[in-house]
Amino acid sequence: MTLPDFRLIRLLPLASLVLTACTINAPKGPGKSPDSPQWRQHQQDVRKLNQYQTRGAFAYISDDQKVYARFFWQQTGQDRYRLLLTNPLGSTELELNAQPGNVQLVDNKGQRYTADDAEEMIGKLTGMPIPLNSLRQWILGLPGDATDYTLDDQYRLSEVNYHQDGKNWKVVYSGYDSKTQPAMPANMELSDGSQRIKLKMDNWIVK
């Protein structure tokens, strides 16, 4: 279907949303080998998580637009997840619900859109080419389909480089939340050319 040319409202940044380097268990020292048993065990532990949720600050920055928001990400089952973007006043600007074969997005005017690919739809409706299909793995600290990545000294992802469909995404992790088991990302930045996506996770609930 042809999707309308909708643009997410530009949200005013607040001091509370400034994304700074995380000091929670930040990566340091020389990286570890991707072939290490500790890394394989960490991946297995993360993949066992069936349900999880996280919330925090989101920023999308490019030559054309800057968007700052709060986000809430909830996964309720395999390939079933919900993404909310809210403004500083707490009002919902975008709600996306995805399940296999069906994606629904509701904008800040209550307009509902449906499609079968979340990544394509959110890109067309908001003008933000967010790599949702890969981000679902990256936000967990997993490389997804990427084969070019490095680990930190705690056998967790430190950097990912992924090339697909003319995009060259680089993902850098600058902190992990060690209060959760397994440790989950607390700060990450995605970049492709002049585009940057920053995520700062306030907390995680994992099951």
Swiss-Prot record:
Q: Where in the cell is it found?
A: Cell outer membrane
Q: Does the keyword Protein transport apply?
A: yes
What the entry lists under Pfam families is as follows:
LolB (PF03550)
Mark the residues modified by lipid (S-diacylglycerol cysteine). 22
SUPFAM superfamilies for this protein: Prokaryotic lipoproteins and lipoprotein localization factors
GO CC terms in record: cell outer membrane
Q: Where is the lipid attached (N-palmitoyl cysteine)?
A: 22
Q: Which InterPro entries match?
A: LolA/LolB/LppX (IPR029046), OM_lipoprot_LolB (IPR004565)
Chain's role: Plays a critical role in the incorporation of lipoproteins in the outer membrane after they are released by the LolA protein.
Membrane topology term: Lipid-anchor
Subunit structure of this chain's protein: Monomer.
Q: Which residues form the signal peptide?
A: 1-21
The name this protein goes by in its record: Outer-membrane lipoprotein LolB
Q: What is its main location?
A: membrane
- Entry's CDD domains? LolB (cd16326)
Origin organism is: Citrobacter koseri (strain ATCC BAA-895 / CDC 4225-83 / SGSC4696)
Question: What's any GO biological process attached to this entry?
Answer: protein transport
- Family stated for the protein in its record: Belongs to the LolB family.
Keywords in UniProt for this one? Cell outer membrane, Chaperone, Lipoprotein, Membrane, Palmitate, Protein transport, Signal, Transport
